[in-house]
Amino acid sequence: MILSDRDIKKYLEEGKLVIHPIDDPQKQIQPSSVDLRLGNSFLHFKVEGRAYIDPTQDSPQELMEIIEIEEGKPFFLRPGEFVLGTTIETVKLPDDLVARVDGRSSLGRLGIIVHATAGYVDPGFCGQITLELSNINRVPVALYPGMRICQISFYKLSSPAETPYYKKAGSKYHNQKGPTASRLNIDFCKKEEK
């Protein structure tokens, strides 16, 4: 069951679901989702001179540099470019909800992809949402910190998760702040230790 605006407001009022800060509830709360805003930090790959990235050998965190954008200034996402962004809002899900993050239609019509594959948010997750931003247009697109960039919708589980994200061993992205690079290399390190 997808939560309606009425249910989203109830979950927020009761503190079961946390989205902070919601700057303008009238604009951000939609009929069955909440619009989230773009933060001002971006992670950009420093891959010049590299033939490929090997997640078993490379630490993606070391391959990225942070770009901070001043308030009111645009970040230009070039054609074919891929960067990690973040939402301003921190989201905390209860154990009986999962969430789905999708791009806003208005940005999709400009060729902006908001997530490559990671649109699913586990029950019990807490943190800012990392966005996998890319531009499939043929011209750069200006993105402004503070603009509504994506929407998050919520799905009720048949029962609360037995092991929500915050209790799961190896939860790599719990309590993440800002754009967070892939931690896939940790999976390979754990296999080698066994």
From Swiss-Prot:
Key words of the record: Hydrolase, Nucleotide metabolism, Nucleotide-binding
InterPro entries associated with the record? dCTP_deaminase, dUTPase-like_sf, dUTPase_trimeric
State any single GO MF term: dCTP deaminase (dUMP-forming) activity
Top-level enzyme category: hydrolase
Q: Catalyzes what?
A: dCTP + 2 H2O = dUMP + NH4(+) + diphosphate
Q: List the catalytic residues.
A: 132
Please, one GO biological process term? Answer: nucleobase-containing small molecule interconversion
Q: Where does dCTP bind?
A: 104-109, 122, 130-132, 151, 165, 172, 176
Pathways per UniProt: Pyrimidine metabolism; dUMP biosynthesis; dUMP from dCTP: step 1/1
Q: What quaternary structure, including any partners, is listed in this protein's UniProt entry?
A: Homotrimer.
Describe the task this protein carries out: Bifunctional enzyme that catalyzes both the deamination of dCTP to dUTP and the hydrolysis of dUTP to dUMP without releasing the toxic dUTP intermediate.
What protein does this entry describe? dCTP deaminase, dUMP-forming
Name of the gene encoding the protein in the UniProt record: dcd
